[in-house]
Swiss-Prot record:
GO molecular function: proteasome binding; zinc ion binding
Entry keyword annotation includes Magnesium: no
PROSITE patterns with a match to the protein in the record: ZF_AN1
Organism: Mus musculus
Protein residues bound to Zn(2+) 3: 64, 69, 87, 90
Name this protein carries in UniProt: AN1-type zinc finger protein 1
GO cellular-component term (any): cytoplasmic stress granule
Top-level taxonomic group: Eukaryota
Segments for region (ubiquitin-like): 160-260
Function noted in UniProt: Plays a role in the regulation of cytoplasmic stress granules (SGs) turnover. SGs are dynamic and transient cytoplasmic ribonucleoprotein assemblies important for cellular protein homeostasis when protein production is suspended after acute exogenous stress. Associates with SGs and is involved in the efficient and specific arsenite-induced clearance process of SGs through the recruitment of the ubiquitin-selective ATPase VCP and the 26S proteasome.
Gene that this polypeptide is encoded by: Zfand1
Length: 268
């Protein structure tokens, strides 16, 4: 009787056994019997080849350059002054002790002079009138402060002595016109902006170079406060200070915009 052509011969030279259910090696693609189906048993030519597989879940991360900080971000957050990478918590100059912080001071001095000129123009330039206006603003802020303390949102873990309260007027087009908030006196303006944005659920793309920046603006001058200054610095200023219990404005501005226009329209 003729032999049926069923199955295949094992490719191991000293074996050549016909197997009706042969195994195909996924390494060398050879045909083998049950005894020689493992790579070791048939001396597979591919057994020592290491195939690199792409890691589909691997993401590039960026470590913070601030000493002692172990935070990482999925996007690069580079300080435009010292050009080092930081986490969102340390991205502002004052928060990472930027080595280039002094460079901005001459420009800020000129900006402060411009603010004084604007305020003087609005008040007629009279010193006595200016002092009277400042006293009036301070008194109004003290009255407002008592009301703000009753319903302001903020970090409840902050000591009472470090809390500073504001009526924060939100960007045009927001669902709410304003929101009472309190912040730590020692925070940088940049951190105040980030915290206020989270409380009011505002879009905050301050870490993107091309996007409009969310800025905290002085009332009544409309000056966009430098992100690296501290809140305490503006509370203790002799000229054009921020008042605990006073008003501030949040708005999206381009990098070249240093002042907010139509300040009164936010307060109406």
């Amino acid at each position: 009787m003729a032999e049926l052509d069923i199955g295949q011969h094992c490719q191991v030279q000293h074996c050549r056994q016909r197997d009706f259910l042969p195994f195909v090696c996924d390494g060398c693609s050879g045909i083998f019997c049950l005894e020689h189906r493992s790579k070791d048993s048939h001396g597979c030519s591919e057994v020592n080849v290491v195939k690199e597989r792409p890691k589909t879940d691997e993401h590039k991360s960026y470590s913070c350059s601030f000493k002692g900080c172990t935070d990482v971000e999925l996007v690069a957050v580079i300080c435009p002054y010292c050009e080092k990478n930081f986490c969102l918590r340390h991205r502002h100059q004052s928060d990472h002790d930027c080595e280039k912080l002094e460079v901005a001071k001459p420009r800020m001095a000129a900006t402060q002079k411009l603010v004084r000129d604007i305020v003087d123009a609005k008040t007629g330039g009279a010193a006595s009138k200016g002092r009277k206006g400042a006293k009036s603003s301070g008194t109004a802020a003290k009255v407002a402060l008592m009301k703000l303390k009753m319903h302001a949102d903020g970090d409840k873990s902050l000591p009472q002595t470090e809390r500073t309260y504001f009526q924060v007027y939100l960007p045009k087009g927001s669902k709410e016109k304003s929101k009472a908030m309190f912040f730590c006196l020692r925070w940088s303006i940049g951190k105040v902006v980030d915290f206020a944005a989270s409380l009011a659920n505002l879009r905050n793309e301050n870490n993107k170079l091309t996007a409009k920046k969310l800025r905290l603006c002085h009332v009544p001058s409309g000056e966009a406060l430098p992100l690296d200054h501290t809140l305490e610095r503006w509370i203790t200023k002799e000229e054009c200070p921020l008042y605990n219990g006073g008003n501030v404005i949040l708005e999206y501005l381009n990098d070249e915009e240093q002042f907010l226009k139509n300040v009164d329209s936010y307060l109406e």
